[in-house]
Amino acid sequence: MIELLLLSFVQGVAEFLPISSSSHLILISTYFNFENQSLSLDVSLHIGSFIAVIVYFYKDLINFYENKTLFLKILLSSIPVIVTGYILIKTGQIDKIRNLETIAWTTLIFGILLYISDKFKLQKSIKEDFSFKSTIFIGILQILSLFPGVSRSGIAITAARFLD
């Protein structure tokens, strides 16, 4: 019970920051030697975060849905990661990347990318009028968020900063 409370707390905090909540769940579970930490538990915790967002932002989401073009672009950008995630789960490959070495490398690599975007002052604003080409680009790069250590929001923000 304590491990579920701790993992829920970590998920609740990490999900809303541009850091990988999945990597933090793995790190906490490894550090405390939790035996039941699995992909199924991670998915359950992510679903809990998703439901919390829907409840909290219900009115905003209804207004957001009225902007059909932006809504469509966000849905479109989610398709690559959903399809790839499904394939990785069905083939069992997802379990091979859920480890501390992957977390270390992805954190290092994407930290460097973020540093580069900061160093070169890549300050792009995410506007409602970004192109469908940009939508696809960001969607494809979100596939990388399937690796623990890569934040989905972090990779989307970093990718957007590199757009023309």
Predicted regions and their residues:
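Multi-pass membrane proteins that catalyze or facilitate reactions on polyprenyl-/lipid-phosphate substrates
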Residues: 1-164
